[in-house]
Amino acid sequence: MTEYALLFVSILLVNNFVLVKFLGLCPFMGVSKKLETAIGMGMATTFVMTVGSMFSWLVNEFILVPLDILYLRTMAFILVLAVVVQFSEMFVRKVSPELYRLLGIFLPLITTNCAVLGVVLLNINLSHGFLKSTIYGFGGAAGFSLVMVLFAAIRERLAVSDIPAPFRGSSIALITAGLMSLAFMGFTGLVKF
């Protein structure tokens, strides 16, 4: 049980996909302008990464490995993720049309989010079992969501701040992301895993 908790904390804080591995930067910068949009994107990404990790592990273990077609891994995983994203898109459209409108093009683009595909490929490369893959996917998604929500809250504050003209927009956003990355480096010694 401790091993799973350490894995979760490790991927959530110490090895965060956005701030340490630099995966998922497109939605991180694009969707994080409003807090409610970032929360919605975080929830959708959490669902996709967790369920995608589970199904990708199952596809790998019960289809790709037995049939010795490992060269189709990336294509198979993208297909699995596309199905999960399509399901989540239909769900969000039905449950919250306003959130669906706010997320816009970023919801279908979860399929090509490198953090989503990255967690699936890392699960296979690290030889995680089913439970570890699920925890790794959920922890990675929780870390992605945490960073995205924190960044959106900071950007909302920056939008009403008096920032010098050369630093407005993307400049201050990148500086803020860099400072957040430095702050997360403080967690480096937290978990030795």
Curated annotation (Swiss-Prot):
Enzyme type, top EC level: translocase
Presence of keyword Transmembrane helix: yes
GO biological process, one term: electron transport chain
Keywords on record: Cell inner membrane, Cell membrane, Electron transport, Membrane, Translocase, Transmembrane, Transmembrane helix, Transport
Intracellular or extracellular location(s): Cell inner membrane
Membrane-protein topology: Multi-pass membrane protein
InterPro entries: Ion_transpt_RnfA/RsxA (IPR011293), NqrDE/RnfAE (IPR003667), NqrDE/RnfAE_oxidrdctase (IPR050133)
GO CC annotation: plasma membrane
Domain of life from the UniProt record: Bacteria
EC number per UniProt: 7.-.-.-
Keyword Coiled coil: no
TM ranges: 5-25, 39-59, 62-82, 102-122, 134-154, 171-191
Family to which the UniProt record says this protein belongs: Belongs to the NqrDE/RnfAE family.
Biological role stated in the UniProt entry: Part of a membrane-bound complex that couples electron transfer with translocation of ions across the membrane.
NCBIfam families reported for this sequence: PRK05151.1, rnfA
Complex formation: The complex is composed of six subunits: RnfA, RnfB, RnfC, RnfD, RnfE and RnfG.
HAMAP family, per database record: RsxA_RnfA
Name listed for the protein in its UniProt record: Ion-translocating oxidoreductase complex subunit A
Taxonomic source organism: Pectobacterium carotovorum subsp. carotovorum (strain PC1)
